[in-house]
Amino acid sequence: DIIKTVMELRARGVEFLSPPPHAYYEDIPKRLGKHMSMMKEDLNVIEKLAIMVDADEDGYLLQIFTKPVEDRPTLFFEIIQRMGAKGFGAGNFKALFESIEREQAKRGTL
């Protein structure tokens, strides 16, 4: 359960990459297409927790990435929950890249 996991990790001090913009979450129904009817998770909660959503022909997935865990921004963890999807969230690549860039800008390492 990615929602409970992310909430617990945040409570324990784990920091995640900054969330995609609100427009990202507005586009989720379009990205999920036929899989939107399968989605049980509340989109408001997904957005509040900054969890990203993607789909492939087999289903959808939920994923989030921690901030880098070392001084060099090269190691981070991914939390992923697959709901039939077999891919790796390729549709989230741009959102992930932009989030990493925002974090680097905050750190002054862009």
Residue ranges and their predicted role:
Residues 1-110:
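Glyoxalase I/VOC metalloenzyme domain signal
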